[in-house]
Amino acid sequence: DKIELEVTKHWEDNSNINGKRPISIKYLVSGNNKTKEEIVTGNTTTDENWNYKFTDLPKYDSQGNEIVYTIDEQEVTPGDLKFYNKSITGLNIVNTFHVPDERISVNVSKHWEDNNNINGKRPESIKYVLTGEGNVTEQVVTGNTTSDTDWNYTFANLPKYNSQGNEIIYTIEEQETNQNDLKFYVKQANGNYKNGFNMVNTFKVPLETVDISVNKHWVDDNNANG
């Protein structure tokens, strides 16, 4: 005797609003130490075309016992279901959108272009400001005033994805710890959050001008001699 088993699927992802649903999936039906596989391509915004019927499955094993079949699904391409949790009840598979709680670290390094602070204008500390998805993390770092030692910092345990499953893009900025700490420096940020940021501070005297008032007084009896 032969039987048929139809696998049904439901996506809990608000019609794929975040664009993370794969275009295809692999179904597996296993029984009596044998497995059949089938790749199914379905609609990326509805549940349409995601069901599949396995046919011509033996009902009994060689001892006449009814075979118990189980189903499962696998990714066609690695990462296809990264943003989904799956739940299997009988022959129904439910995939629920879920953002994994992955964490990353962002490294910040610094280089001073000031001839080892020969002019004595380098500050003792600096504030690094890391921004991602509107969230701001600040860190004050105190470093060596004649070298690049101790100016690096690592922002750790940062969320990798936002609530839509998109990778968060982090940007870096530095600020003065005290007013005018960087008055004699031009700052430049290089790199990115994936490979690390490098902050370069180059010594430069600002082009500031001052006004000088000159007062004159004539001691000549009001120019009596012409």
Task: Please place each PLM-identified region on the residue numbering.
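Solvent-exposed loop/turn and edge beta-strand elements of beta-rich ligand-binding domains
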Residues: 1-226
